[in-house]
Amino acid sequence: IQLQNLPQNHLPDLREARELVKTGNYEAMEFLYDDIPDTLSQLIRTAFVPREGMKFIVADFSAIEARVLSHLAKEEWRSEVFKNNGDIYCASASAMFGVPVEKHGVNAHLRQKGKIAELALGYGGSVGALTVMGALEMGLTEDELQPLVDSWRSANPNIVQFWWAVDRCVKKTIKERIDTETHGIHFYYKSGMLFIELPSGRRLSYVKPKMGVNKFGSESVVYEGVGGTKKWEQIESYGPKFVENIVQAISRDILAYAMRTLSHCFICGHVHDELIIECSEDVSLDAICEQMGRTPPWIPGLLLRADGYECDFYKKD
């Protein structure tokens, strides 16, 4: 089963709706809920239950990609936000607009701009990425989009530098067939493949890399792989996209490390950065989150945090 593809649950009375279905009270269902198919789809997750006398602990990392990206790029103000358990969306808006921003306080209206900028712009995204992320539907105007991109990049110069440092390393490695390194990431060419070695020692591989020209007439990297059409084809990439690959791969390695530190637990599922653990009622949620949030020895200084909740059936909190 692909847990990540299950519909999310937003019903405020999820438990009550679940009980109605369990007891077969379909008349009450029809009376209480306008959209029965939607209600039933939201209950699919709740079909997964722990054994008798057990519970689920569902824990995930807090903003893991943003933390890894900030750490690799050495964007210190962001790492300071994470160190103090701050709100990265507020902090980002504050850095972008030069004013204090509080979630439910001063300049709270700017937090939404900080949020969409964080979600859309970390890997080289621009106006198009903001639009795809729903910026216009959130109330932003088209005239605000480019200034938002410019503000985010000005507030995060080290991340921007990281994108293009990776871009230079990849191109130099492909062109000259030599090893390069930046920000603790090692790049090398071997047997017709580009390899990117991560801090964990794991490698990303790109088949038959070469230099090409993108639709804007600029130099770009091209390699072979499974594209959006699910067919083997030529794939174009560049620095920020490679950074996305690197950050997401490191985030995956951190999850794998957490699973090993929690190997004494019964991990019955994991989705993206989330672990689903079946355990006895006396197991502490805080203890699980503390263990999950431990930094692997191969990436010292990275600040991690895990949060979670307990439930007697699977759901999104």
What annotation goes with each model-predicted range?
Residues 1-317:
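Conserved catalytic core of nucleotide polymerization and phosphodiester-bond processing enzymes
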